Amino acid sequence: MHNIHRRHFLKAAGAVTAGLVTANIALNANASSVAPKPRVGKSVIGLIAPKMELVRVGFIGVGERGFSHVEQFCHLEGVELKAICDTHQAVIDRAVEHIVNQNRPKPAVYTGNDLSYRELLNRDDIDIVIISTPWEWHAPMAIDTMESGKHAFVEVPLALTVEECWQLVDTAERTQKNCMMMENVNYGREELMVLNMVRQGVFGELLHGEAAYIHELRWQMKEIDHKTGSWRTYWHTKRNGNLYPTHGLGPISQYMNINRGDRFDYLTSMSSPALGRALYAKREFPADHERNQLKYINGDMSTSLIKTVKGRTIMVQHDTTTPRPYSRHNLIQGTNGVFAGFPNRIAVEHGGFGKSYHEWDMDMQKWYDKYDHPLWQRIGKEAEINGGHGGMDFVMLWRMVYCLRNGEALDQDVYDGAAWSVVNILSEQSLNNRSNSVNFPDFTRGAWEHATPLGIVGA
């Protein structure tokens, strides 16, 4: 979606910052020292919506990420693209043109102001809404979507405060609507293969994971009026913590059955100095440019350590500033061996095709041949053709539609989105309290202990 005018961002971000200060004082940096309020509805773990012969879709935000979803949905069967909403006419025109060029009916359009999306939500011919907007709008739009009787599918992160996480959970439980944060990396070929290997016991009992979003994005600072950098840059002036934890953390969480037999217990976090963005601004912009007037406070490298209730450990890192190759780490260590990503490599004590665990096995093909996930076996070629981060976007959307049309539970629920996203807030709370540990809220209200782990779903 087109960037919200700066005053809207500053107002929203200011409220977030004020909320964090209040939370730190009230909770002494302990996010779950206050017991959750009683559940209003019922748990949505394993929620199955009534089968939909045709999935009717509305889109809020069709800029960069949102337009990618429009493109992918045009390749899916059993869907209708009913309506789109954005505040920027150019991206609306592009989306409409693309949909029509794909021989699909012209969608209805909603625009004009930041709340025009509510007109889209008033329609009674939409089943699900895809939300691809600046971060501060994710939770409010998802809540409004569920309140309107529709299922919400939200870009990452799901929320920016602990309170927003609880509001999303409470709304999903009360309305019995899906609220899925669309963590696409969980549908990558490597990630799904590793999930299959974990479920088959290849790595033994799991002990430790490492997750990251290391992606040099300083160039986005040059996006001043439109596109992601026009609003995302400001978050580096408002928070010091892990701004974007879910891409790496999502897969590790599913490997470890987080919220389905285990859960995050507490976190400790620290950050490096915040130097890189100011240096980049000084080098790339005139001295009097706005980018040189900002005070960048988010540490160039954020590192958090999570302890789970079962005693496992997870390292989570965030760095979108320093010059280095892309990585999500994607490391999972068990009693029989380890998988690590970027580049992909495996070492196991038993069952390693004769390779010693003292050296990495970099030849992935034989592992794919044995452990490739059924979803990628079924639609991998189609995913590679249609693209979207190597095909993971297509697999995710395909799977979402499949579940809705066949009466199956989604692979990710509101509790997952809340638990993975809340690292954003808790990392800052820990850092502001000399890296003392901060407890995770139990968004499942205890239901994690008996929830069924995600299986190796087919198609």
Swiss-Prot record:
**Record note on cofactor:** Binds 1 NAD(+) per subunit. The NAD(+) cannot dissociate.
> Which segments of the protein form a coiled coil according to its record?
none
Binding sites annotated in the UniProt record for substrate? Y213, R232, Y244, P245, T246, H247, Y326
Q: What class of enzyme is it?
A: hydrolase
Identify the EC number(s). 3.2.1.-
The UniProt entry's sequence similarity note says:
Belongs to the Gfo/Idh/MocA family. Glycosyl hydrolase 109 subfamily.
Per the entry, what this protein does is:
Glycosidase.
Q: What is this protein called?
A: Glycosyl hydrolase family 109 protein 1
Name the species this protein comes from.
Answer: Shewanella sp. (strain MR-7)
Q: What lineage, starting at the top, does this entry show?
A: Bacteria, Pseudomonadati, Pseudomonadota, Gammaproteobacteria, Alteromonadales
